[in-house]
Amino acid sequence: EMREYGIIRHVGVSTHSIEVLERIVEGDDFDTVMVEYSAFYPQTADLITRAHARDIGVIVMRPLGGSGRTSEMRGRIASGYRGVLTPRNLLRYALAHPGVSTVIPGARHPSRVIENVETASDMAPLSEDERSALEAESALLY
């Protein structure tokens, strides 16, 4: 109703529930949806594709897997870890999905914001092999 009166232009919703997301994608009430999607949580990939096909904007939350995983990952990197599971690659993973409109990674430090912007600005395409490696490694580690 507020849209009809010109008070608002768009309506969005945030959810962690796949069941709720399915109802949103099938309905006509929302213009955007904010969902969790990452190599740690790829279960929403198909629903993101369906939302995009219905012209529903998709905002990805927690593309790095959440603060606990991110802190642990950065600790591993500082200790010499050299696998594929890095914050940069996780951002690439989320941004590579054609149905994703934008991602909102959390950042506790200004340097992380700069790193995230640089990743998004200079993002190399993610190959299918890289995607598979990220999903496999995230499943093993977490």
Regions inferred by a protein language model and the residue ranges of each:
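Glycine-centered small-residue hotspots that permit tight backbone geometry or close packing
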Residues: 6-14, 106, 129
